[in-house]
Amino acid sequence: MNCFEIGCIAKARAIEKGKLSILLISPRTHNFYSDWSVPPIGPAYVSAALKRHKKTVFTLNLEKEEGSIADIVQNAIKEWDIDIIGFGALIVNWRQAEEAFQAAKECKETIITYLGGGSMTCSPTEMMELIPEVDIGMIGEGEITACEMMDTLEQGGDLKNVDGLVLREPNGDLHYNAPREIIRELDSLPWPDWDGFKFFDQEPAGDFPNRLVCAPLVTSRGCPFHCTFCSKSTGTAHHQRSMDSIFAEVDHLVQTYGINRLFIDDDVFALPIWNQDAGQESGRKYKSRLEEFCDKIKPYSVEWLLYLRVGEYMTDELLSLMKASGCVEVFYGIESGDDTVLHSMHKGITAAVIEDTVRRTHAAGLGCSGTFIFGDPAETLDTVERTFAFSDRLSDQFTNMSFTPIILFPGSSLYKKAVMEGKITDRVEFIRNGLPFTNLTSMSEEEYRELIRERIPAQRVKRMICEETSHRPQKLMIDYNKKALYINHVCRRCGSSSEIYLRPESLTDHTYHLCPKCKQRVDYIVMKLYAQLVDQYVEELLQDGQTVLWGAGTIYRYYQAFSGVLGKLPYLLTDSNLDLQEHGVAGHEVVPPDKLREKGICRAIIMAWYNYSPIVDDIHKNYPEIEEVYDFRELVFHNKQSADKRHL
């Protein structure tokens, strides 16, 4: 709908009902965590602001709902008589927003839709074209904008007067309102609507005394640094909440929900001050904010994790103070082990500084995680080798390392470079195709594709095997009634035994908990044990040649590394990714989905995280001959007879 139609419909509905009702939706994230998750909280902030503004607000957390997104949304619209539906989405889950809005328009033609979140903030033009069912785009922070939008709609005003919106003109053009100023007084915002989005309605984790109840805690917004790969969806102006405001919320979380772990969900928790005279970073302000937080959080006896920047200001004294106050893990932005690449990324750090900070963090008894990304314009075969060697040298210092190609997120400097150089010719199709990996390096296309398809996945598997050997999970147990996996584990540091509940998604190197005795991180690499449990059933399904493995990404690669079946049986593998179709995966052909009809396929095993629901919907709509669909993550529960024991 265009802005004129929206105004007419909203005015009529407001006269009829007195107030408009809005439904806010939080996407499915399929978190990889074992006993806690940190879902996106942007919609929860907007919901809290609207409720404080006395609006009629309903909420859906798709992560907590069973069934298709279309059915969930349509049922909610009918039950609650919804007038407006809002969705907060990142680029990676825009298809969920599309599905929700399409279902909404089918259910109620006059419903008003708006899209917010990082996807709209970074790519408003593209998202409005990509999802024609979106009536209103909301750019930037949504708390004030959403309230003004609702007021304007209920009062019959002109939406063009609401800062921070993108609207459709009657002729189809887009109208960009004035930008919304950033919210500098973060203390003025209400706390997120935890209850509305069922944040703490976690699945039962058994009678374990170590069960974690984790809450995300936003203490600041914005990041002033200029890393070339970052989309800057939160802006470059850094503004912080006061400690009084922060700990009023901590009090509420602990007393009301029994929180025993906090994840500080800031781009940068505190900033070092650049000392122009000394030519180096000074830690005075940075240290004082961290010190104050440590002093205040210690009496709560909760665990906490955060993102920080490496540097000399991370002193041994500060790290010890963090450890003593309950900090269990620090996530550092590593990115590369090569100084040339780090400089090209505008990181402002060196490999030597990274190594020094990581080693001192580990020595302080804190968990240390880092991500290595590949494909910067300065990347060469030599820099790749140096980064791999760097990660190997520090392998025993990290509790978690991940390896991934650089993704060109809209809004980032690298994305803009790719557009200017003609590497991205259609920005809408680029998003629709899932932000395909794009070669900005001086490497040949063949060398780059080999890095993406073979070398980075091999480094991931190498890390997995290293962790599996060092941590040694002893038992993978299955509860068929609850569809739950449990691991019994002996800590390699202190020798104590613990059990932990796992989501069925927890088959990658992103799964961990803390040893209840020594509080050190324990990584679970369960794919090897899981593969042993499901191999027999997979073999039965593949035997007649009528089963396809759908999805050639991470979960497939990890299963391929540990499966005793895939290496001895012919099987069909499909994926919509054009690059995978062209080059295959680990020597195996990837068939386009539209070629399946001629293959006589009648069943599919879905091997995907984020795209599971869209794949299933696609199969139901376009491949009726595929009558049986299995979720690989839950395949073990179909295999009760093959796994006649509860554990290995």
Predicted regions located by residue number:
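C-terminal accessory regions of radical SAM enzymes
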Residues: 3-7, 14-33, 166-169, 382-523
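Conserved beta-strand elements of the Class I
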Residues: 21-23, 215, 228, 546-550, ...
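Glycine- and acidic-residue-enriched helix-capping/strand-helix junction motifs
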Residues: 31-43
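Generic structural signal for well-ordered alpha-helices
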Residues: 43-47, 73, 98-101, 150, ...
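Glycine-rich beta-alpha loop elements in corrinoid/cobalamin-binding modules
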Residues: 49-185, 405-407, 411, 628-631
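Conserved C-terminal portion of the radical SAM core fold
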Residues: 52, 84-86, 112-113, 247-250, ...
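Radical SAM [4Fe-4S] cluster-binding motif and immediate context
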Residues: 192-367, 499-514
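Hydrophobic, well-ordered beta-alpha structural blocks that scaffold small-molecule cofactor pockets
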Residues: 482-503, 513-648
